[in-house]
């Protein structure tokens, strides 16, 4: 009975607090945020890794998304390899909005094969979570319109000066780097296989490249004990504690990933933070070079060739928010739409003398923030911020220490919604 009464109370409290939030503002756009693929000579491809067949990935009529590429400086052969990778991705994700890529074939550092990444959007109508950055191509799909018509969704650069490219689509020689495979890797970053947590001067922060706030990818990141890296009670941001987590053991634990692996998957987290490499890739030990999921490890070896992304890569993009098509859909399946909003259950006493607690369950991935305010709306205490998933509740604890007798309100923002829970402190 207490649960039913509380849910009804939340509906009333939420209405009282949601007036300002209901006013729509223009979406924020930033970017691009790039991941860099370096030249690494110590990585060895598995035997036969260069011999994968790379035929037409699907019938053109069966493609799930239209991609439009603006090519700058490409030779005919390099452009053909790039376009083949684009065509593969067009068979694996579904969108009714055109995905636009700006691709440059240009001189880069001798130690760089290429880089790419998405422009980012947050707080647009139609996006599932508030204050979370989404890759522009996905944001367009979720919003049902092009949110930034004058800008590409993905920006990419590849090293035209590098002397050891394999630009054909046949078997990759053992002494060359396969351009098709490198482009396939970088487009995955552009579609959202990229995180927004980073280490700066030994301190972990929620943000990167002068951009603050979490990415959709970050909602699914946790430590070895299952604690979300966005949980500010465990990992304040900025903090050395968050930096230690990002450079030790990080796992991706989305619903789709658990479906295909029955467990979280390890992300690349070397002891020394590697900008553009750490955290935004699969672990290079857990996933063998030359395998389909090895595609999204942080390095590509000479002679390594991959025909398409693997099941884990597909699942990560599904958890970020993509609807899958073709071989990705066949591997991961369809994720049922997450509906039902937010449910809050009082798990501690109310009124209370020393402490009480709430259990928050969200039907969709998002950020949860809880603040305690007094009856005049003045902030009394920050109760924490964390990532919430359908299978990962948010426990809110309120301590009475330092509070006078009276009525207080837990102002709870989850995703794009906002609810309020009145609490009474008695002495």
Role assignments for model-derived ranges:
Residues 23-184, 189-328:
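Extracellular zinc-dependent metalloprotease catalytic-domain scaffold
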């Amino acid at each position: 009975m207490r649960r039913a009464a509380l849910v009804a109370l939340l509906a009333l409290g939420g209405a009282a607090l949601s007036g300002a939030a209901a006013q729509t503002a223009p979406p924020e756009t930033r970017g691009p945020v790039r991941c860099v693929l370096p030249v690494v000579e110590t990585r060895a491809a598995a035997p036969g890794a260069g011999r994968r067949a790379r035929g037409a990935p699907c019938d053109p009529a069966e493609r799930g998304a239209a991609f439009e590429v603006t090519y700058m400086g490409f030779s005919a052969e390099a452009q053909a390899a790039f376009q083949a990778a684009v065509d593969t991705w067009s068979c694996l994700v579904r969108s009714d909005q055109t995905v636009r890529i700006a691709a440059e074939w240009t001189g880069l550092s001798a130690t760089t094969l290429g880089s790419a990444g998405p422009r980012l959007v947050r707080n647009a109508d139609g996006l599932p979570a508030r204050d979370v950055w989404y890759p522009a191509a996905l944001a367009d799909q979720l919003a049902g319109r092009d949110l930034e018509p004058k800008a590409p969704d993905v920006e990419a650069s590849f090293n035209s000066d590098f002397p050891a490219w394999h630009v054909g689509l046949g078997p990759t020689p053992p002494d060359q780097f396969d351009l098709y495979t490198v482009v396939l890797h970088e487009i995955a970053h552009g579609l959202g296989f990229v995180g927004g947590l980073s280490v700066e001067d030994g301190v972990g922060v929620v943000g990167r490249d002068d951009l603050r706030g979490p990415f959709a990818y970050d909602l699914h990141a946790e430590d070895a004990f299952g604690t979300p890296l966005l949980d500010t009670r465990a990992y304040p941001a900025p903090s050395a504690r968050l930096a230690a987590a990002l450079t030790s053991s990080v796992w991706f634990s989305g619903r789709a990933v658990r479906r295909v692996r029955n467990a979280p998957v390890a992300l690349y987290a070397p002891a020394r933070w590697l900008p553009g490499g750490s955290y935004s890739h699969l672990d290079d030990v857990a996933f063998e070079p030359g395998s389909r999921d090895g595609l999204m490890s942080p390095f590509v070896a000479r002679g390594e060739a991959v025909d398409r992304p693997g099941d884990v890569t597909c699942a990560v993009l599904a958890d970020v928010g993509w609807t899958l098509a073709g071989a990705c859909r066949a591997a991961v399946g369809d994720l049922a739409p997450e509906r039902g909003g937010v449910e809050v259950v009082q798990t501690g006493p109310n009124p209370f003398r020393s402490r009480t607690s709430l259990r928050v369950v969200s039907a969709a991935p998002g950020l949860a923030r809880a603040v305690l305010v007094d009856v005049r709306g003045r902030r009394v205490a920050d109760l924490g911020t964390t990532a919430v998933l359908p299978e990962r509740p948010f426990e809110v604890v309120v301590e009475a220490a330092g509070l006078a007798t009276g009525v207080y309100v837990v102002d709870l923002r989850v995703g794009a919604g906002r609810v309020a829970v009145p609490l009474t402190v008695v002495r």
